[in-house]
UniProtKB/Swiss-Prot annotation:
It is a multi-pass membrane protein. PROSITE patterns: CN_HYDROLASE. The gene is lnt. The lineage of its organism: Bacteria, Pseudomonadati, Chlamydiota, Chlamydiia, Chlamydiales. Pfam families: CN_hydrolase, LNT_N. It comes from Chlamydia caviae (strain ATCC VR-813 / DSM 19441 / 03DC25 / GPIC). Pathway: Protein modification; lipoprotein biosynthesis (N-acyl transfer). The chain crosses the membrane at residues 21-41, 54-74, 89-109, 116-136, 157-177, 189-209, 506-526. Its main location: membrane. Its EC number is 2.3.1.269. InterPro entries: Apolipo_AcylTrfase (IPR004563), C-N_Hydrolase (IPR003010), C-N_Hydrolase_sf (IPR036526), LNT_N (IPR045378). It is found in: Cell inner membrane. Keywords: Acyltransferase, Cell inner membrane, Cell membrane, Membrane, Transferase, Transmembrane, Transmembrane helix. GO terms for biological process: lipoprotein biosynthetic process. This is Apolipoprotein N-acyltransferase.
């Protein structure tokens, strides 16, 4: 009976161990959830389950847990029914990885290979690194150690070892609690050490930084949240200039003076330079606020940006599409463009693209298969990853490290911004592809980790997601209402004086390299251990 209860309790604890769902389940699940699961299936008591039974139960447990974690993908209004196939393949693949890892753990426990038991956390980190950096564009969401970040101390631990350190310590905590349930010697002390280590280390660092935090240097930022996306809402009647109507109306709310005005990802259609807006129609919309400097017959989005920049006497940062001709071919980029009062235009092209939404995985073969069997999902024009640096430097502003969409969830990418001298992280996002889902919260709780990993403040500009400004300790300064299952996002302006204090972190210095080394060392130890035993067995024979 205890085994059945342990199995069910472990499912409940881990399924809801998501920082966006419950900080309580996140902290309790990371402490005892995996240990309860492993003990329920292999308590080293009779009756023992067969390997087939173990594998089946592990896969069932894992696939249903991951199904809950990625439930936001099932919002199919814009992405279509094919997303159910993608969701099923993704959670099955992740479940297979966890099932294989757990079976290896049970094999080691059954055969009493205790010398390599503590190599398993490093092995799991290696497994996650493969899917983190090499599965399509990288699957950075819902890594195993994410529940640790449900409080500020756990997030601050990421400033030492990043996401990989969090996953390592969570697996070590799970294994040690499993050993506690098996009544192994000293296991209780090991479990308490693994459990408390990230919170003590992160907590001491966090409290020290909080007590020495300075608010002397501030940046006056205004962020526009349209609460809609022209990209998703489709064509409208009337002049193309109507695309700017809501943005101009919201901009009129902004109070001067302001140092930087930010708009979200792909705020308006037609790209950066395409001249499609009739001057007369555009001037009618813009006239309550300001006017255009040049009276060209047709205007482009950069002309609107320049007019706003001149009016507010500050740079404008906006998400736009950008077309570029290379080798007689047109290439499409998802870009962030920044224009100054003096007309200086600096941009960044998104480097980590969303598979399926911005490109078809598998190259020409993948695109051909998609076009033949799923023609409605074959993208008419695929974006390509950019090469321009995401660090944007504009006169009278600190250097900004710009990311687009889920790029902000990759610590190694944004770590380069810190090394290039960026003082502020800016993310432009459109979470509207999955309306009335958990995605805005999931995305935010992954992205905000970069503040404490790198010791930098951040600003997020979203259409319907979480538009927020937070300091370098991850403390929210101001947040706008965002879309959930129960409410729609509200159009608005986030205007805030953001503390610009930065601080150095070990993760910014060494990134994932210590955990990569530890993972390779763990794999090497496991390989040498089994290799030595195999050779010894052959010699005896």
């Amino acid at each position: 009976m205890f085994r059945i209860l342990s199995f069910l309790c472990s499912w409940i604890l881990i399924a809801f161990a998501q920082p966006d769902m419950s900080w309580f389940f996140s902290l309790l699940g990371s402490a005892v959830g995996y240990g309860l699961l492993w003990y329920s299936l292999e308590p080293q008591k009779s009756p023992k389950l067969s390997w087939r039974q173990l594998t089946s139960l592990l896969f069932l447990w894992s696939v249903t847990v991951y199904g809950v974690h990625f439930s936001w993908m099932l919002s199919d209004l814009y992405v279509g029914k094919f997303i159910y196939v993608v969701w099923g393949v993704l959670i099955s693949l992740l479940a297979l990885l966890f099932t294989a890892f757990s079976c290896l753990l049970f094999f080691i426990v059954r055969k009493k290979h205790t010398k390599i038991l503590w190599c398993l956390p490093g092995l799991w980190v290696a497994v996650e690194m493969v899917r983190f950096y090499f599965l399509c564009s990288g699957m950075s969401l819902d890594y195993l150690g994410w529940p640790i970040t449900a409080n500020a101390y756990g997030r601050q631990f990421g400033g030492f070892f990043g996401w990989a350190g969090e996953s390592f310590i969570l697996v070590a905590t799970g294994i040690s609690f499993y050993q506690v349930l098996l009544r192994k010697c000293f296991s209780r002390y090991v479990w308490l050490g693994c459990l408390l280590f990230p919170y003590i280390l992160g907590g001491v660092h966090y409290e020290y930084l909080k007590n020495t935090f300075s608010k002397e240097e501030n940046l006056r930022v205004a962020v526009i949240q349209p609460a809609s996306s022209m990209l998703l809402e489709g064509p409208w009647s009337g002049s193309p200039a109507m695309a700017w109507q809501r943005l101009v109306s919201l901009s009129s709310i902004v109070r001067k003076p302001v140092d930087l005005l930010i708009f979200p990802e792909v705020s308006v259609p037609f790209g950066r330079d395409r001249k499609v807006y009739p001057y007369d129609d555009s001037q009618v919309i813009l006239s309550p606020l300001t006017h255009f400097k040049h009276q060209d017959e047709l205007l482009a989005n950069v002309d609107w940006m320049q007019a706003l920049s001149n009016h507010f006497n500050c740079p404008i940062l906006m998400g736009l599409e950008r077309w570029e001709e290379l080798d007689s071919k047109l290439h499409l980029y998802n870009s962030a463009e920044c224009i100054s009062q003096h007309g200086e235009l600096i941009g960044y092209d998104k480097r980590i693209l969303v598979p399926g939404g911005e490109y078809i995985p598998g190259g020409k073969i993948g695109w051909s298969v998609c076009k033949k069997y799923f023609p409605e999902y074959a993208l008419s024009c695929q974006r390509i990853p950019g090469a321009r640096s995401g660090v944007i430097e504009v006169e009278n502003l600190p250097k900004m490290g710009v990311s687009i969409c889920y790029e902000e969830t990759f610590g190694m990418l944004l770590r380069n911004y810190k090394r290039e001298g960026a003082k502020l992280l800016v993310n432009l996002t459109n979470d509207g592809w999955y309306p009335s889902s958990r995605l805005p919260q999931v995305h935010f709780y992954h992205g905000i980790l970069r503040n404490q990993e790198l010791g930098m403040p951040c600003v997020r500009s979203c259409h319907t997601g979480i538009t927020v400004a937070a300091d370098a300790l991850g403390r929210v300064i101001k947040m706008l209402p965002y879309e959930t299952r129960y409410r729609k996002a509200s159009p608005g302006v986030l205007q805030v004086s953001l503390p610009m204090q930065n601080y150095p972190t070990l993760y910014a210095f060494w990134g994932d390299f210590p955990m990569i080394f530890l993972s390779l060392l763990s794999i090497g130890c496991i390989g040498c251990y089994f290799g030595y035993r195999l050779l010894a067995k052959k010699e005896k024979a």
